[in-house]
From Swiss-Prot:
Name used for this protein in its record: Transcription initiation factor TFIID subunit 9
Keyword Electron transport carried by entry: no
GO terms, molecular function: ATPase binding; C2H2 zinc finger domain binding; DNA binding; DNA-binding transcription factor binding; p53 binding; protein heterodimerization activity; transcription cis-regulatory region binding; transcription coactivator activity
One of the record's GO cellular component terms: SAGA complex
Annotated gene: Taf9
Function: The TFIID basal transcription factor complex plays a major role in the initiation of RNA polymerase II (Pol II)-dependent transcription. TFIID recognizes and binds promoters with or without a TATA box via its subunit TBP, a TATA-box-binding protein, and promotes assembly of the pre-initiation complex (PIC). The TFIID complex consists of TBP and TBP-associated factors (TAFs), including TAF1, TAF2, TAF3, TAF4, TAF5, TAF6, TAF7, TAF8, TAF9, TAF10, TAF11, TAF12 and TAF13.
Species of provenance: Rattus norvegicus
Family, as annotated: Belongs to the TAF9 family.
Region (Disordered): 150-174, 233-264
Amino acid sequence: MESGKMASPKSMPKDAQMMAQILKDMGITEYEPRVINQMLEFAFRYVTTILDDAKIYSSHAKKPTVDADDVRLAIQCRADQSFTSPPPRDFLLDIARQRNQTPLPLIKPYSGPRLPPDRYCLTAPNYRLKSLQKKAPTPAGRITVPRLSVGSVSSRPSTPTLGTPTPQAMSVSTKVGTPMSLTGQRFTVQMPASQSPAVKASIPATPAVQNVLINPSLIGSKNILITTNMVSQNTANESANALKRKREEEDDDDDDDDDDYDNL
């Protein structure tokens, strides 16, 4: 520590000499050399803040200049904000006595650190795991069949219509393509029956194929081509021939009835 006389030579600025004199008047004779610089910086910052606040108060009061009342108000507000005095000792003792009268929670006798419950400790987890949302099951009366797309060939299911079921010809052909891994998967192709205008209800029809199950393990790395035809040409020709024969039989029966009527 250096004395104040050694820290304030004649070469010091006037502000530094004044700060050294203030310290000497307060009975501070020993201090470090940089204490004067810190005190000067604090005084400059404090005075600048007070004058800025006084200018704001003066403009708010619509005064042409800053007067002493504005400076006093700024000093009072700054003192209440920055230089708050601690509460008295007796007041702190009363608060501490009331706080200590509250009993601490009981510690459960178990192995581990002897700490109060988690809600009284800062070590309790402050997060909660989010539960996974389960998807709603599909209703039993409604089955959604996705669009089948294997390679470059696709088959889109259509909505089934009410009517007389008609036979459908289905051909499944395979062609070599890019290898695919289809192990453990199973595809369902739904082909609903539709009514054909060329066939009447009096002709018995073969039940149509509704579902075709394809096991990829039997196919391997091949593409699947599924094509459906409404009614084959042979079935249409047979139906037309049956109708023609029925009409001829009806015409023959009519001719026989006419001959019998003439004979009578």
